[in-house]
Curated annotation (Swiss-Prot), chain B:
GO biological process: DNA replication
Domain of life: Bacteria
InterPro entries reported for this sequence: YabA
Subunit structure: Homotetramer. Interacts with both DnaA and DnaN, acting as a bridge between these two proteins.
Alphabetic keyword roster: Cytoplasm, DNA replication, DNA replication inhibitor, Metal-binding, Zinc
Name of this protein: Replication initiation control protein YabA
Binding site for Zn(2+): H86, C88, C102, C105
Gene: yabA
Reported cofactor(s): Zn(2+)
Disulfide bonds: none
Organism: Pediococcus pentosaceus (strain ATCC 25745 / CCUG 21536 / LMG 10740 / 183-1w)
Function as written in the Swiss-Prot or TrEMBL entry: Involved in control of chromosome replication initiation. Inhibits the cooperative binding of DnaA to the oriC region, thus negatively regulating initiation of chromosome replication. Inhibits the ability of DnaA-ATP to form a helix on DNA; does not disassemble preformed DnaA-DNA helices. Decreases the residence time of DnaA on the chromosome at its binding sites (oriC, replication forks and promoter-binding sites). Tethers DnaA to the replication machinery via the DNA polymerase beta sliding clamp subunit (dnaN).
Amino acid sequence: MEDLKNLTNQAVEKQPEIVKRFNEMIDSQHLSHAYLLTGAGGIGKKDVAQWVAMRLFCIDLQGSMPCGECEECTRIISGQHPDVVEIAPDGQSIKVEQVRFLKAEFSKSGVEGARKVFIIEQANKMTTSAANSLLKFIEEPSGEVTAFLLAENRSLMLPTIVSRTEIIELKPLPKDRLIKELTEQNIAETDARILTRLTNDTSEIQTLVDNNWILDAHKALEKWFITATTGDITAFVDVQTRVMALAKDRFYQEKILDLMMLYAMDLLELKFDQETITYEANRRQLQELADQTNVRQLLAVADVLLPLKHQLSQNLNFQSVVEKATIKICNIFKMRGR
Amino acid sequence: MDKKDLFDQITEVTRNTEDLLNKLHETQSAMVEIMEENAELQIENQHLRERLKQATAAENEGTKNTKYGLSKSLQNLEKLYASGYHVCNEFYGKHRQDEEECAFCLTVIYGDR
Amino acid sequence: MKFTIARNTFIKKLNAVQRAISSKTTIPILTGLKIEAEEDRLILTGSNTDISIETTISTNDEEAHLNIESTGAVVLTARFFGDIVKKLPDNTMLLEVKDGFQTTITSGASEFKINGLDANNFPHLPEVDSQTTITLKADVFSEMINETVIAVSNQESRPILTGIHFTIEGNKLSAVATDSHRLSQRVINLPEPIKMPEDIIIPGKSLLELSRMLDDEIDTITLQISENQALFTFDETLFYSRLLEGLYPDTSRLIPKESSTEMEFEAPELLASIERASLLSHAGRNNVVKLTINAANKQAIISGDSPEVGNVEEEVVTKDIVGEDLEISFNPDYLKDALRSFGHTSIKMAFTSALRPFTLVPTEDQENFIQLITPVRTF
């Protein structure tokens, strides 16, 4: 029960404005037949859709809030409500049988009452023909039907679908809230701060947290950066011995480049006496380094690191790109180590 | 190849096959869609040609009934139906599966007037 | 919840409810059977959302030997619960649900403990309090279903045609089904007129399942309609079916009002001829037979020609032929289905042209039952 309650609150907490908007639409009976909810993963798209379903079905409304505890609410949250039909891609795409099931459900009356809600997750993973075949139902549904199509980005959807739905863009979650959420999942606050600088997407964050990747990456890059900024050319070796093991694929490689960039940004922040930095744990060392170098040098570091992501996207080899950058950084700080 | 690799491989192959099958399904429905669109365009084209004819030959005294007592426009529909597409209100422009006859279409073309 | 019951009665009721339970479902709890014990009765429910079956066993039922010690409800996985109950050793069984929905089933020396689910998560069937209650003879209604369901479409691309369209107006209940290749329509007269006209589409699959449950022991069946479900009640059983939403196409214009050729015959005679002719048409590539009518000679010939296999020709025994000569081709399977639905009776077949649908009606009752078939164009 406890975590079920949490889920109710998530729509309200993550997207309070959207929830308020839906509340008004329901009160004034201006709910449309089809919505396209867009926004990054973990932003609360499904929470919002389920919240609306609960708002419509709840038998114990608390003011304008679903109770989250009645039979209707709990069945919606656990995906067991026969009149709240949920579809998510089975593997790479939404399969032909799934679309068949959806169409059949669209053409039948509700099981328990006249009202039906459809939630289609990652709706962009429908094939063009599948999406087109659903158009008819979205456009002129029979009965009290509300369909939610969820996608990260509206540009991923067919224009025919976009033009027939009301589009609601969900706002990115506030950073503080995300950090709080992560620390609740036993992620150290310093790591949480770094993670939220890398991405807003909770599923990406999960990937980065898995197997302690972020922890290992933080350690490896800390050693690499400190070594490089003392002008010590052994930082070049660190790339092979420490960094490469973490750069499993393009996704991780990009994140490594982002993490490197964040060091350069921290140095600049400190040089200009800014309070918040990413690598709070290394504040003392970074402050010292910032004090000892001039702005020109720090900008040079940023200049070295900035183009790396672009180079990577042009299929240049990750290791050689990073090694080259390492040598350049060492050169900038050559005088300092001696 | 040890057993686990073998197993992984077969899983991989199965997955690939599934993907391929899905793609086939997609391609198939895409093709049907294009055919249907094509049919609709044909109808439209026919209509346009008809209009063109009417416009250029103003002396033409209305639509003459011809074969089976069908008017020109009904003949067009008949032609379209014969080439495998629905002409009825219910499924207009859709491909007739397996060339099965459709009572709705036949009523539109030959029905009582 | 705790009760004892005679196993025979329980199994019989369980079998009825199990018709609605499928092991393939998107909602896990629907693989389950809901058992609910009230003060004076036991209610079993199964549902695949399309149909839901609820049946009641009363404590007054002498054969059931039902004794309810405490009330409550639980959902048990239908497949293995059914298997367990069927294999229990004794004539009676005891079922008890403890905290956390753990369920103990005891019979003779055997005791099973299985995990149940919260019955609150089971779909809630709507209360149907419609003013219109239609009472029908079970055998007549079952016949009506079987006569019309043959023409229901099995293509999901046209969901609305997968149902039978029922309209009730005055004292007439009419059922129509068409897959656009053929059409069946049956009308029955109700003992008294209905106040509010009704218009619903019930999935053919649901109705087939219903007609299988209507055995000789069942005399009458009632139909009630709510906003989202049709409810059929017979004996102690409630049978719910979801409806198909949308507008059913206007089928009345499909039926030709006039005819140019008419032929009368006994259904079994033509059926036998068609069955023989279709032996070849099935073997060939296009499943078509041809009917050639020579009105002057009162002669009707069925022929099938499959270039790869061979050909067949036979003269049909008819009672009468009037009108113009005609050559018409059609899918013999549609005619077979239609003729079978008539049984042993005299039929009138009416044609307007080789291109338009033709109709079959019983000579005795030409108003209330019609089968329509679309010819195949052969040019």
